[in-house]
Amino acid sequence: MSEQEQKVEIPEVEKQEEVVVEETQQAEHSQEFDPLEEAIARVQELEEQLKTQIEEAANKEQDILLRSRAEIENLRRRTEQDVEKAHKFALEKFSKDILNTIDNLERALATPANKEDESVKALFDGVELTLKELVSTVGRFGVEAVGVVGEAFNPDLHQAISMQPAEGFETNQISVVLQKGYTLNGRVIRPAMVMVAA
């Protein structure tokens, strides 16, 4: 080979070597950054997963908190209602028992007697005052009488003993009250025993 040919080949070989070196460096450089870029991408992916998990956990905890608050509020409300009912109806048994006394005083006033006699009249007046005071006292605690002649029959408040035609009364009107009924704060503690017009 001539010197000139060698000179031509040398720069070309040098250029080729430079290209190979550059490619090698780029390959080495890209190999160095590929794992780094992969690691960065993986870290970002894991960060997103963690953010999602944290949001889900926060939402779950928020839901649990709201449910717990609602349960506490419901429990408080139920307890208040139970206490209120206990106050309202604590007197129910006592009221039922005292109704017999009221009935007996009313029967005593309904007995035929010589009311012209002063001693009998004084006795009746005393029984009447006692009855009024007793009815007034139980009334202050929510006990009210039900079952009045002429009022419409209500199966929630009245117990019909019989139905029979009665003059001056419409069908399903109370014609006779055999025993008064009573309610305690609107709740029936004893239905009125009545006869109903047919």
From Swiss-Prot:
Keyword vocabulary terms for this entry: Chaperone, Cytoplasm, Stress response
Disordered: annotated span: 1-33
NCBIfam families: PRK14140.1, PRK14150.1
Biased composition, class Basic and acidic residues, residue ranges: 1-18
GO CC annotation terms, alphabetical: cytosol
Gene3D superfamilies in UniProt: 3.90.20.20, Head domain of nucleotide exchange factor GrpE
GO terms (BP aspect): protein folding
Native organism: Haemophilus influenzae (strain ATCC 51907 / DSM 11121 / KW20 / Rd)
Compartments reported by the entry: Cytoplasm
Main location: cytoplasm
Chain's role: Participates actively in the response to hyperosmotic and heat shock by preventing the aggregation of stress-denatured proteins, in association with DnaK and GrpE. It is the nucleotide exchange factor for DnaK and may function as a thermosensor. Unfolded proteins bind initially to DnaJ; upon interaction with the DnaJ-bound protein, DnaK hydrolyzes its bound ATP, resulting in the formation of a stable complex. GrpE releases ADP from DnaK; ATP binding to DnaK triggers the release of the substrate protein, thus completing the reaction cycle.
InterPro entries assigned to the protein according to its UniProt record, in alphabetical order: GrpE, GrpE_coiled_coil, GrpE_head
Assembly and binders: Homodimer.
Protein name (database record): Protein GrpE
Family: Belongs to the GrpE family.
PROSITE patterns in alphabetical order: GRPE (PS01071)
GO molecular function: adenyl-nucleotide exchange factor activity; protein homodimerization activity; protein-folding chaperone binding; unfolded protein binding
